Amino acid sequence: ELVDSVSKGGNLLLNVGPRGDDAQIPTPQLDRLKAMGAWLRDNGEAVYGTRPWSFAEARTDDGAPVRFTTRGDRLNVIPLTAVGGGELVVRGVALSGLGVRLSDGCPVELRAEGDATRMIFARPQTGAFAPAVAIDGGAAATP
């Protein structure tokens, strides 16, 4: 929800309330906040201080949503899924250039293929959901 909202110029309102009997945050809410914090620690550059790009959303070959944000001359591509293997195809936007996976600095090659982008990761993703990929200054987009 956070990435989807930010990619469209919005904010995410968190409704977290402590229990009345002991003023503790319920475990399910706390777990979700911790998971969001861990993701932001690795990928926050794709969220904080960003703006929507000319395309807010796209889909992968298998139908998973992809979101885009931008800051200055950096484009962030954020597939809202785990990337199994070393490649991911994003439909509806053709990008080319080189990027980097924010969570670990892994190089990512972007190849335009018709109306799609093939993202080729130098190393497989390890565990993280929604790996943000940053492309500095050189992403050419063909809608």
Task: State each model region's role.
Residues E1-P143:
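Mature catalytic domains of secreted/periplasmic carbohydrate-active enzymes
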